[in-house]
Design a protein with these regions (language model features):
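A structural signal for multi-pass alpha-helical bundles of membrane permease subunits
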Residues: 2-284
Length: 284
C-alpha cells in the first residue's frame, strides 16, 4: 500500500513539474517557432503555433538589416560579456580566497561590510551617483565606462559560492605548498584555481547569462553612442524604430539568435555548472 501511495505521489509530482516546465518554456518555444513565419502570417494569425511554411528569410533579413547593425551589436555583446565574465571570475575568486585563507584583523567585520555593499542593487539609488562619478572622469559614455562599473558591482552570490567551495578544500594542500616555498599568490594561482574549476565554471555561466541579458545599464551608457549598443538594447530599440516596429518577424528572429549563446554556454559547461553549484552551496 505504501509503495502504491509513493508511486502515485511521484506520478503527481512529475506531472506537476512537467506542466510547470511547459508553462515556463512555452513562450521561448513560441518565439523560436514563430521566427520561421512570415510577418504577414504573424500579424494575421498570431494564435497559430506552427507556421504554414517555414522560411529562413527572417534570419537573413536580421543579419543584413538596415535598421540596426546586427553584426556590430553581436560583437559588442560578446566583448562586453566576456570582459564581465573575466572580471566576475577574478574578483569573486580573489575576494573569496582572501576572506577564507587570508589572515588580517577584523576579517569577519570587513566581510560583512563588503557583503552589505555588494547587496545594494544597481537601482535608482546607486545609478545616479555612479554615473555622476564616471561623468567627472569622462567615462560615462559607451561600454568602456560600464566595464569599469562592473569591477565594483560583482554579485555577492558569486563570492559566497566560491568561498564555500574553497572552504571545502583540505587546508593540508596549501600547508604543504607553503613549506615548499610557495607564496600566498602562487598558491592561489597554481593550486587553488585549478582545484576550483567547477565553481569557476558556475560563476562564468551565471556571469555570462547576467551580462548578456543586461538591459538597464547598457541602455543608459550607450544612449549617446548607438554604435556600442548590445543585442538586447538593439532589439528593444528595433521595436520602437518607426517602420521596423511592425516587423515582428525580425524581432522574433533576433530574439531567438540572442538566446542561442546562453544555451551554447550552458551546454558546454553543464557538467561543471551542476557540480560547482551543489558544492559551493555546502558551506559559506
Amino acid at each position: 500500500m505504501n509503495t502504491k501511495v509513493s508511486t502515485a505521489e511521484k506520478a503527481v509530482l512529475y506531472m506537476f513539474l512537467t506542466v510547470l516546465a511547459f508553462v515556463a518554456l512555452f513562450p521561448i518555444l513560441y518565439i523560436a517557432v514563430s521566427s520561421f513565419k512570415s510577418n504577414s502570417e504573424i500579424l494575421a494569425h498570431p494564435e497559430w503555433i506552427l507556421p504554414r511554411e517555414f522560411t529562413f528569410d527572417n534570419y537573413i533579413q536580421v543579419w543584413k538589416s538596415d535598421y540596426f547593425d546586427f553584426k556590430r551589436m553581436t560583437f559588442n555583446s560578446l566583448v562586453y560579456t566576456l570582459v564581465c565574465v573575466a572580471i566576475n571570475i577574478f574578483v569573486s575568486c580573489g575576494a573569496a580566497y582572501s576572506f577564507v585563507r587570508g589572515q588580517f584583523r577584523l576579517k569577519k567585520v570587513i566581510f560583512v561590510m563588503f557583503s552589505s555593499i555588494m547587496f545594494v542593487s544597481m537601482g535608482g539609488v546607486t545609478i545616479y551617483p555612479m554615473f555622476d562619478v564616471l561623468n567627472a572622469i569622462n567615462l560615462n559614455r559607451g561600454l568602456y565606462g560600464l566595464m569599469v562599473v562592473k569591477l565594483f558591482t560583482v554579485p555577492i552570490i558569486n563570492i559566497y559560492l566560491v568561498k564555500g567551495y574553497i572552504q571545502s578544500l583540505p587546508y593540508e594542500i596549501e600547508e604543504a605548498a607553503t613549506i615548499d616555498g610557495c607564496s600566498f599568490t602562487s598558491i592561489f594561482f597554481r593550486i587553488i584555481m585549478p582545484l576550483i574549476k567547477p565553481i569557476v565554471a558556475t560563476v562564468a555561466i551565471l556571469s555570462f547569462q547576467g551580462s548578456w541579458n543586461e538591459y538597464l545599464l547598457p541602455t543608459i551608457f550607450t544612449q549617446s553612442v548607438p554604435a556600442q549598443r548590445t543585442l538586447i538594447v538593439g532589439i528593444v530599440a528595433l521595436k520602437s524604430s518607426g517602420e521596423a516596429a511592425s516587423s515582428w518577424n525580425l524581432m522574433l528572429a533576433g530574439s531567438t539568435l540572442t538566446v542561442l549563446p546562453i544555451l551554447i554556454a550552458y551546454m558546454i559547461g553543464n557538467r561543471y555548472f551542476i557540480s560547482g553549484l551543489a558544492s559551493g552551496a555546502v558551506k559559506g
